[in-house]
Amino acid sequence: MANMTSSVSASQVAGELASATFEEIPALVEHYREDPRQQVIKACERALKRHAKELAERERVNDMYELMHELGGDGVVVGVDEVGRGSVAGPLTVCAVCLPMEPRVWGINDSKKLTPARRELLSVKIAEVATAIGFCHIAPKDIDEMGMARAIRTAVAGAVADTGLEPDCVLMDGNPLGAVPNARDVVKGDAKIACIAAASIMAKVTRDEMMVEYDAEYPEYHLAESKGYASPEHIEAIRKHGLCPLHRVSFCGNFLQTERLF
């Protein structure tokens, strides 16, 4: 049993395998593969399953980067996504992100498919590796004045400009073409293309943080929980207290029992 290290307890081996990184797992499993102890055998099996799952996840992310390059080419490629389109309070937020092909941000996906904690972690990694990140926020009163279609076009143009880049290609997820030059629309792009997914995550995390801050100013509207969307608690608060300056008046008519505004 050449590969067995008898001086190391089975519990220690199991702990080592459980904490091993994706890159470390194959060598560790090879090192302990002839160890006959059941705890070690089970730990190796769990590690291999974890490695296989992570490998599949990395292949998914690799595909997102490859499609980004396929559609965008070798020039400056920026991904754009928005959050807050359907909310009744708070801004419309658009983010634009330029990602290099390397290093890759493992785990990126459509922000709606990620937990808040996962989005927070990924937003830090995206900020570390991105070539550029830009934001544009359209205030509720401006959304009321210009309408959502124009607001999105304005925000897309503003976010791309905020990157400081002149992109050769702008990849967008369902946003209106014509807002910026060299734009390409990709249906469900936030789940298919790396830079759009990154923009989706950054937009969501940034706007959510804004809504939590607004909640401290207007606690009666439950903005930290609802993020400005029409939750039952938020609707009831609108009916009870009327609207505050964060509300989109044009979105809230059905919720008001009186004409009382702010």
Language-model regions, residue ranges each:
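RNase H-like, Mg2+-dependent phosphodiesterase core
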Residues: 1-78, 85-262
